[in-house]
Design a protein with these regions (language model features):
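S/T-rich, low-complexity, solvent-exposed segments of bacterial secretion/appendage proteins
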Residues: 1-731
Length: 731
């Protein structure tokens, strides 16, 4: 190489350095840009025999300054940060509406206040049972509470609509990024095909990595660089989004058994493959799905459980009372049955409903019902089978009781392969209302029976106020032989029957329910009835008890018959229904030390003390229009009674649990979001320290290359002058 060539190589190297530095300066603010620099190496020296003489410089490549480790770390923390922030953005409005602990207002607890206001109205009506304004105030507070339930449920529904819209938007963005990545892969293939070996299109690689970063903020992905320089992108449980110049797409679809839920499907040719939400993690889409499945659904169901539990328990007690006109209490709240959603692929026309029959056992779970000749019911919260082999006749007749719910085949018939999803609590708060029959005269504050001791009694005996037996009471049926049994209301302690004659297969009816036992019974067999649910608790026979059917109120047609209890001695008494002139019991043993619980015609009372011979006590109907408030007091007591979650908490306690669950999750996400933001900032700083453009450094390099360029020019000028001098010499 001549001296001219050496100078030109220096000039070219400086020129490329200046061009690359200018490129860096121009893209200092370009997202995803990685600083570039030229790599210079000496040209091969010339062996002159008296030593190797250098022949200038060559630029071997223009390289990107990149740490693949930091790039991977940045993608991971960005995906996690996007997921957490997406979740947080969804939960904050919900938490604010509930009045939770992570909200900026830190809680108004509107529903809790409404519940307290409702029961304050119940107490006021109970304390003034004949006061019409107090009754009207109770109705107003009931409507206010129902409105709060409905408003909160609307908030949940709006959140669900918003989540579905954002899921669709996120899927659309993912598809767009995947298509752009596939196109860039194609451009990279073409660029590298015409380039010398080892040379890469830096700017195209930057664009691809920027797109990968944007994609990763929508959904967590992993990237593998192939031998041809293309990037393959995977997500979920290994599904391919991009391979070479081919992009695969996602699609949203309405869930087959839940029209309010969007599923994400992976499109593989003409096949749609559902991707479980738990397989989609990271990015905004992962956060949206996590919010929906982990907070929105459970929280809305928890709200519905409070609404159903309160309304059902209140209805049950209200139906045991008497209104101001002497009529039996009816339903105070209207609770429409929940209809299980049939799968869109179902062939049959079966309709399955759920109603509440035991509010204390309600859960927040949904249930799947499958039919393959018989019905199987699975609780979805823990994916456990709760009932199997249930015939269509059984489901249409007695039905099935699970977790405080009564499942019933309301109409039609299923075809093998049909399935349904029951969501008994989700959305229940929105369907609650005060019954249209409730007005100031139909509120059942009074008890339907009244007890009294005859004024002329000589002993010290007394009779309790008495109460109506509830179908929710737990009752034990104990067989003393194959043809006799005793019945005890274990909730109240009252003996309902002693030595009752039994004919095999004949119905047994107490407290407003009716059941039957199939198979041979024997002494020692014990069966339990609790709110319609039945079980065998003792005994070695194969006898089976059927589910109890609760009758329409009044629970006992003889409830308000006039009853007289007459002591034939200080230790024995007779019971006579004077309305029907029927002797209900004779020579009943009485222990003055413990007293005696008596129950007939659907009521229970207790006699205590030391009655004298011929002392009498009466039980009869409460006179309409009197200031009796016993049922009102029982209704008011429901506020502080643990009637929810297996009798472990009250209505307000169950709502407080909902607040804590949402609020605690919100607080957790606030902390996590701050942490993730800090991690992103730190990782970006570390990545930029290697890949970012520092304008001060570039200015220094520009001066360096400028000086090199000028020096190379001066060198060429000197060489040119030397050659000119030589050429000017005359031979």
């Amino acid at each position: 190489m001549s001296m001219f060539s050496t100078g030109v190589s220096a000039l070219n190297a400086a020129q490329q350095g200046i061009a690359t530095t200018g490129h860096n300066i121009a893209n200092a603010s370009t997202p995803g840009y990685h600083r570039q620099q030229i790599l210079q190496t000496p040209a091969i020296a010339l062996d002159t025999g008296s030593g190797f003489i250098g022949q200038g410089v060559q630029v071997t490549t223009v390289s990107r300054q990149i740490s693949q480790y930091l790039e991977t770390q940045l993608l991971q923390v960005q995906a996690q940060s996007a997921s957490v922030n997406s979740y947080l953005q969804q939960i904050q409005p919900l938490d604010n509406a509930l009045g939770g602990t992570s909200s900026s207002t830190n809680g108004n607890f509107n529903l809790s206040t409404a519940i307290q206001g409702f029961f304050a109205g119940v107490s006021a009506a109970a304390n003034n049972p004949t006061d019409v304004p107090s009754r009207q105030s109770l109705i107003s507070s009931a409507n206010a509470m129902v409105t709060e339930f409905q408003t909160l449920n609307t908030t949940f529904q709006q959140a669900r609509v918003g989540v579905n819209t954002q899921i669709q938007d996120s899927v659309s963005q993912i598809n767009s990024y995947a298509t752009q990545l596939a196109n860039l892969n194609q451009q990279i293939i073409l660029a590298q095909a015409g380039a010398p070996p080892g040379q890469v299109p830096n700017d195209l690689l930057d664009q691809r990595e920027q797109l990968t970063s944007q994609l990763n903020q929508q959904v967590g992905t992993s990237t593998v660089i192939q031998s041809d320089g293309t990037a393959s992108v995977f997500f979920g449980s290994g599904q391919t989004l991009v391979i070479g110049n081919q992009a695969f797409s996602l699609q949203t679809a309405v869930d087959a058994t839940d029209p309010q839920t969007l599923d994400v499907n992976y499109i593989l040719g003409n096949t749609k493959v559902p991707i479980g939400a738990n397989n989609i993690t990271g990015g905004s889409l992962g956060g949206l799905l996590a919010f929906r499945d982990q907070t929105l659904d459970p929280a809305q169901s928890a709200l519905g459980r409070v609404a159903l539990g309160l309304a059902s328990a209140f209805n049950t007690q209200h139906e045991l009372g008497q209104d101001i006109k002497g009529n039996a209490g009816g339903q105070f709240f209207n609770i429409p049955p929940a209809v299980a959603q049939g799968n869109t692929a179902n062939v049959g026309n079966a309709t399955i409903t759920t109603t509440v029959n035991n509010p204390q056992n309600l859960t927040t779970s949904d249930y799947r019902i499958d039919f393959n000749g018989t019905y199987t019911i699975t609780r979805l919260s823990d994916n456990t089978v709760q009932a199997s082999g249930v015939s269509a006749a059984t489901l249409a007749g007695a039905g099935v009781d699970i977790d405080g719910l009564h499942f019933q085949l309301a109409s039609g018939a299923a075809t093998a392969g049909d399935s349904f999803e029951a969501q008994p609590t989700r959305g229940a708060a929105g369907s609650l209302s005060v019954a249209s029959t409730i007005n100031t005269s139909t509120i059942a504050v009074a008890a339907p029976i009244t007890t009294a001791a005859t004024l002329g009694n000589l002993g010290t005996g007394a009779i309790s106020a008495g109460s109506v037996n509830s179908p929710n009471d737990t009752v034990a049926i104990t067989f003393t032989g194959a043809a006799t049994y005793n019945v005890v209301d274990t909730t109240t302690g009252a003996t309902l029957a002693t030595a009752q004659a039994y004919v095999s297969g004949s119905p047994i009816s107490y407290n407003g329910w009716k059941t039957s036992i199939s198979g041979a019974v024997a002494a020692g067999d014990v069966f339990q009835v609790s709110n319609g649910a039945t079980s065998k608790t003792n005994g070695g026979t194969a006898a089976v008890i059927a589910p109890a059917v609760i009758s329409v109120l009044p629970l006992n047609p003889n409830l308000q018959d006039k009853i007289t209890v007459t002591f034939t001695s200080p230790t024995t008494f007779n019971v006579v229904d004077t309305t029907t002139a029927t002797v209900l019991a004779a020579a009943v043993a009485y222990n003055p030390t413990t007293g005696a619980a008596i129950t007939f015609n659907g009521w229970s009372a207790k006699i205590t003390g030391n009655p004298a011979t011929n002392d009498t006590f009466s039980v009869g109907p409460t006179i309409s229009g009197t200031a009796d408030n016993r049922n009102g007091l029982l209704l008011a007591q429901l506020e502080a009674t643990n009637t929810m979650a297996g009798n472990t908490t009250s209505f307000e306690g169950a709502y407080a649990q909902l607040l804590n669950q949402v609020g605690n999750k919100g607080n957790e996400l606030n902390v996590s979001a701050a942490t993730q933001t800090q991690l992103v900032t730190q990782t970006q700083a570390a990545e930029q320290s290697i890949s970012g453009v520092n304008l001060d450094e570039e200015a220094a390099k520009l001066m360096q290359y400028q000086q090199a360029y000028q020096a190379a020019g001066k060198y060429l000028e000197t060489v040119s002058q030397l050659f000119a001098s030589i050429l000017a010499i005359n031979p």
